[in-house]
Amino acid sequence: MERGSPGSSKSVSTFTPDSMSTYVSNCVVCGRLTSLFNYGAHSCSACGSFLRRTLASSKFLDDCKYSGNCFENFKRAIHFECKFCRLHKCVQKGMLDLSRYTHLERLICELSEFDSKRETLFLTMTVSNGFKAEELMWQSSVSLVKKPPHLVFNSHDWGFMNQVTIIDFLKKLEFSKFLSSQDLRSFLKCTHFTQVILKSAVISYNANQNYMSFPNKIDIFPETVTEGTSISVNLQNRIRCRLVNRLIELKVTHEEMLLLCAIAFSNPAIPELSENGRTLLNSYQNVYRSALFQYCSTAYQRNGPSRFNDLLFLLHVVTKTHDDIKKYFTLFQFFQPTEQPSQVHQDVIEFIN
């Protein structure tokens, strides 16, 4: 679901001359009198056209310049020019048309293509010399350059690029452009590491490994950690193996992982997310959950519901892995203060946490 995906091709308005004369009411978005019905709601032509253009645009919406309730007055919008509040009023009224994502095969194809682009960037690119950590929270894409052939990444470098390319990937999702700048920051900070864990596990799983590693089987931990420290081997192995082994046990398919990752990145229960942000993400997550359930029901028939629950439980395994990684970072900083990653890597870690 990349930014700039066009809106539904179905007709924007459906009405008859008789209904025009017998059913005139206020537009549920702006309050104007109208007899039209757009995107599943009683709404005027202007609001229907606005929503269609907004869904088709790749541009981020500017934050509301006022109090965030420009379209709360039902009888008339307070600040009609505020695109941000207008869009979210459309969402509140159920006008966000996600029907184009209900075609399972097409949705999986889009997610697969999008994920493939992200993985290519991860494997072949690096940040430019002038890179600054705050770029990650900007609405624009992160500036990346081709990785020189002589540049060999260590575990810190791969971990850094994994985070950078995943944050860039998340900013390109369709719904990201509808979030306020504050919600976008909260979304990126709280969501990206779940994706880091999932994507790292998937790459290793697809390589027929039973442990998590970076490309070329580079360990996810620095050599100084694996050579023997006060960081327990049991903790290291839980991080490396728990999620990958569960993927192996379940024999998770490519399609299932794509949809599970989508459910994870559209999580509406992010702390500090506004009500508008929660409503928006919930709309998208419902689409992904329905798609995964449909896939499971088709592929596993009577066992579809239990398969669906088994896959969702993987997100709890991700959470446990994340908790273990937090413990590891604390121990690594305490026991090996001289082996920390480069300054730009540390800047990113501090900035996004």
UniProtKB/Swiss-Prot annotation:
One of its GO terms (molecular function) is DNA-binding transcription factor activity. Residues 119-351 form the NR LBD domain. It is found in: Nucleus. Its main location: nucleus. Residues 24-102 bind DNA. A zinc finger (NR C4-type) spans 27-47, 64-85. GO terms for cellular component: nucleus. InterPro entries: NHR-like_dom_sf, Nucl_hrmn_rcpt_lig-bd, Znf_hrmn_rcpt, Znf_NHR/GATA. Disruption phenotype: RNAi-mediated knockdown in a Rieske iron-sulfur protein isp-1 mutant background reduces life-span extension, causes a mild reduction in fertility, and reduces induction of expression of glutathione S-transferase gst-4. The keyword Metal-binding applies. Residues 340-351 are annotated as: AF-2. It comes from the Eukaryota. GO terms for biological process: determination of adult lifespan. Keywords: DNA-binding, Metal-binding, Nucleus, Receptor, Transcription, Transcription regulation, Zinc, Zinc-finger. Ligand-activated transcription factor. Involved in lifespan extension in a manner dependent upon mitochondrial function. Belongs to the nuclear hormone receptor family. This is Nuclear hormone receptor family member nhr-27. It comes from Caenorhabditis elegans.
